[in-house]
Design a protein with these regions (language model features):
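Short pre-active-site segment immediately N-terminal to redox-active cysteine/selenocysteine motifs
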Residues: 71-73, 77-81, 156
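A short beta-strand-turn-helix
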Residues: 51-73, 96-99
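Conserved redox-active cysteine motifs that mediate thiol-disulfide chemistry
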Residues: 77-94
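Thiol-/selenol-based redox modules, centered on thioredoxin-like
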Residues: 156-192
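Hydrophobic beta-strand anchors of alpha/beta hydrolase catalytic cores
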Residues: 74-75, 106, 160
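Thiol-based oxidoreductase modules, predominantly thioredoxin-like and allied folds used
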Residues: 103-118, 133-145
Length: 192
């Protein structure tokens, strides 16, 4: 009987904590139908993108805080083993197609421990985009967890940062997000 009461009390405490944190995290305040009625994992931030030096596909060091100044950039933190990361690639390809001529650039930052060879194989894959097999149409940079955290990565994949034309991080994306919600956020920043 005592064991059952302890379990019941723990369940009540956990339930209360989940309820509290669900409604008090920064991304829950802007819940939206664009994310299927679920709390929107897109939160507002306002800070400069710090110097973030990564290895480009051409094997050159690139500082993301300078290389894309004047463009809206979505930095996608991913790993090849992350199924949510793989699932969002077609959306990222579509965003690049739709907004690329408006000064928008997707930049993927691989934070795999699997190594460059595994990432190269992943990048060469074809993805189904509206019934058409398409390659990634954006650069994939090699990074580390330390580099990603310096840029603003808070842990958990998939994850991303939306950076405005002035080099300021304006949106942080935590976890899987509905394509429509992310597209809406990108469109707003591109129009600014």
């Amino acid at each position: 009987m005592r064991k059952a009461l302890v379990i019941l009390a723990l369940a009540a405490i956990c339930g209360g904590a989940l309820y509290y944190f669900r409604d008090n995290m920064p991304w829950s305040a802007d819940a939206s139908d664009d994310n299927g009625g679920a709390p929107n994992p897109i939160g507002d931030i306002d800070q400069p993108l710090p110097p973030t030096v990564v290895m480009s596909p051409e094997n050159r060091w690139v500082d993301l805080s300078k290389a894309y100044k004047g463009q809206v950039v979505y930095i996608d933190f991913f790993a090849t083993w992350c199924s949510g990361c793989t699932d969002e690639v077609p959306s990222l390809i579509r965003f690049q197609q739709k907004f690329g001529d408006k000064g928008f650039q997707v930049v993927a930052l691989a934070i795999d421990d699997e190594g460059e060879e595994k990432v190269d194989t992943f990048v060469k894959r074809q993805f189904d985009v509206g019934g058409t097999q398409t390659s990634m149409n954006f650069p994939v940079m090699m990074g580390t967890m330390e580099i990603a955290q310096k840029a603003g990565f808070e842990g958990g994949l998939p994850s991303g940062l939306l950076v405005n034309r002035d080099g300021k991080e304006v949106k942080i994306v935590r976890g899987v997000v509905k394509e429509a919600a992310l597209e809406k956020a990108i469109a707003r920043v591109v129009k600014q």
